[in-house]
Amino acid sequence: MDLHLKEQIILLELEKFPHHGQVVIENDVEIFANCSIARGSLSDTIIGQGTKIETSCHIAHNVTIGKDTELRARTIVGGSTTIGNNCWLGLNSTIKNKIKIGDQVIVGSGSSVIYDIVDEDIVAGVPAKSIKIIKNH
């Protein structure tokens, strides 16, 4: 394949940041087709036991996902994000870098999470906002 460049093109030298972490996938995890999981840059990327990651999801570097969490198709999780246990992230949801999502959280389909989410919260929208706190007690 040939490369043809037209006028006013600037090509910059690529800087490579070393990634020393790993991807740790615990027991009973399901990962569907076309998913990408980036290895950690300074710490590991961790997928917790019993988690289900559906088709075409992207999980960036240094992400930690708790146990029994479900990411529906085309979910994108930004770098250094922490997702708790027993969470459900709806189809095509997007999580910004460095977000903390508590345990038992539901993120509505198509939502864009740009703020941390407390335990047992249901959020939806762009940007995602709290709809209801779940109390299982």
Name these PLM-found stretches:
Residues 1-124, 128-131:
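Structural signal for interior beta-strand "rungs" in well-ordered beta-sheet cores
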